[in-house]
Amino acid sequence: MRPGPLTSSLLLSLTATACSHKAPLSVSPSEPRPASVRLDFQPPVDRVLTETQRSVRSVERRGDTLREEVELTTQTRFTPSEGGWLLAQAVPRSRLTRNGQEVPTGVADVLARFTLQAWLAADGTFVKLVAPEAAQEALRQVAPAGTEAGVLERFFEPEALETRARREWEVKFAGLFQRNLVEGQQSWVVDLVPVGDSQVAYVLERTVQGTRDTPLGDAVVLGLRCLDAVPEDAPDALSEAWVMAGRPELTPGVSCEGEQLVGQGRFMPVSRQLTVRATVAGEAWTVTTESRAEGLQEEAR
């Protein structure tokens, strides 16, 4: 059982800094301001949001290529709670393949046995996980004691689980809600992608590119790219995002491209695709993550 390939699947379908500040925004004051689009955080109530997620990691080392792919289905519910929202997410199905061959993993059993719960503020800010120890309890039901169980226990440790959940939520949604967004407007967050025994760090730049009609309604379109350094003449908002994240060392030469669609009106993570490429310790890594909302279903009573 290896936790690594499933890192991005745990969290909140909904994957950035480990702090709770909103991501800074920037738009040139000298440019004419186009019509704005407002995103309010209005989750669907009494509905189950089903998403499919896919993460593909490939690494070239010593002339060989290893490819791992994770596919999973998440089901998410939102309930009003204490002036905010309780998010509850289950992972009823997950699948890992390595070089095209399915690999049995006890991690899938753990994910299927507990529901991840997070408390969000009224404006969509991530506050904390609720009862994160449920993950380790599920692990004890699945994994026998031993060295590998110890690795998984650390992976599902409440503090580590909350850090990953917070980062994944914020890298996708921090700074987008309760604000008027205009085309060309940019925001920045620091993201980390685990690769082997190391990680890739970069500043993710999100640029508002307008709106698009989708089967799930109108959505705001965000173009995604990453920066491997903070330029000397960087906007204050970009520098602030890096400082807020603790001034991490960014991975030289990292590149990425992608797109994210967030529904207008009620909260709907329509889709997201991001491909990250980096060379770490002489190994060439490519990590692609994709998520797509399949729709809402009325919750059974």
Language-model region placement:
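Signature of exported/secreted
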Residues: 23-301
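Bacterial N-terminal signal peptides that target proteins for export
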Residues: 1-9
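C-terminal motif of bacterial Sec signal peptides marking the signal peptidase cleavage site
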Residues: 17-18
